[in-house]
Amino acid sequence: MSHIGSKQIKIPKNVSIDLSMNKIYVRGDLGKLELPLNNINIHLKNIENDQFLILDPINTGTKKQKTASYIMWGTYRTLIENMLIGVSKGYSKTIELVGVGYKAQLIDKKLVLKIGFSIEINYEIPSDIKVDCSRSNIIVISGIDKQKVNQVAAEIRLLRKPEPYKGKGIRYLGEVIRLKEGKKK
């Protein structure tokens, strides 16, 4: 069994947490997030001017409910930790466009991509995500919700996945594409 759920989470100084019914609300300098909780108890603990969150699975109810609470214990801990980091520091993901004539522009709240198709592709950016195109072949996606930032990055990457022969396409910064060898005569 994994012990991720039993580790305590340190709360940063600039973050406030509200626990109500079956939800946790996290507020910080960059914004606020909420998460519905099922079959999990949360306790706040003070140790030497630092606040910690401790998660416990609910041990009452049917065997099925107990099992479900133990299964989700580590997941909830990680989600809450991601929320705390998101509202205090934020998350960002960088994408690069590799190919001749591949360009990206930000027009209003749309990302306009020229990626080798006969038409330009318009990608609608969600309201809580920030996109920066300071260079025409680099896209920086940032926000406070880790899941949304990575989801937007994955959706943009899927528009033109890197192909295995020349490596052209949209890829994450630092991603290594293993190239295949072409036909030999």
Swiss-Prot record:
Subcellular location(s) of the protein: Mitochondrion
Single Gene Ontology MF annotation: structural constituent of ribosome
Protein name listed in UniProt: Large ribosomal subunit protein uL6m
GO terms of biological process kind: translation
Family named by the database record: Belongs to the universal ribosomal protein uL6 family.
Lineage top rank: taxon: Eukaryota
Bridged cysteine pairs (disulfide): none
Keywords: Mitochondrion, Ribonucleoprotein, Ribosomal protein
Lineage: Eukaryota, Discoba, Jakobida, Histionina, Histionidae
Coiled coil: none
One Pfam family from the record: Ribosomal_L6
InterPro entries for the chain: Ribosomal_uL6-like, Ribosomal_uL6-like_a/b-dom_sf, Ribosomal_uL6_a/b-dom, Ribosomal_uL6_bac-type, Ribosomal_uL6_CS
Keyword Ribosomal protein: yes
Keyword Glycosyltransferase: no
Primary location class: mitochondrion
Cellular component terms per the entry's GO annotation: mitochondrial large ribosomal subunit
